């Protein structure tokens, strides 16, 4: 399977907007509402979800993860020179990006659903300890823009867009986070090197204009190799698909936010 790191890095630059907290001078400041899914901007998280903290005074520097930060296939818990760490339920969250107003991290995959405490520490100065409830899944599609889901044509990985729409009967790749447990399980800190399908695949659905696509149209749903927290769905567009349908993902009782469309030209 082709590496998806360049695409995932592009996904990571698609930033959600969150409520601005009221901050005290100097200390890291954020709120429960400003800890959100990095894909959708919704305050819904699950284990193995790519997440963002928005606030003030989160870091003195701006840094994104680089290959040199990854040692022996393990993600960093702090980016060199930043002095920033995030703890989630007593474990360090692995970092992808830090800046004064935003920090991107991975919710540890070994956590269980339920309430956890999230706290950001900047060079020994701690921000508030915020209580957040983790769901078993918090589906969220990465976005090309505020109303368009991010998708790639198969097999060349070019972007699906209004200028290059998907077609019925053709395969596309969708990119998401928060889809829940996989088999074999995601391991704490380790970058996945092989495919790992959703554990509850029978409870996973892709909805186009509210209608579940046939099971045989989902060729794969699970981790995207080479990038922790990123999920890949291989979807064959149904022959009946209309133009630019709304697309949502459902994992168990949890659905991705409404309002995103997938560019399709019947």
Where are these regions (language model features)?
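Initiator methionine at the very start of the polypeptide chain
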Residues: 1, 18-19
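Sec-dependent signal peptide recognition
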Residues: 2-7
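A sequence-level detector for low-complexity, Ser/Thr- and acidic-rich stretches
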Residues: 19-266
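Hydrophobic h-region of N-terminal signal peptides that target proteins for export
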Residues: 9-18
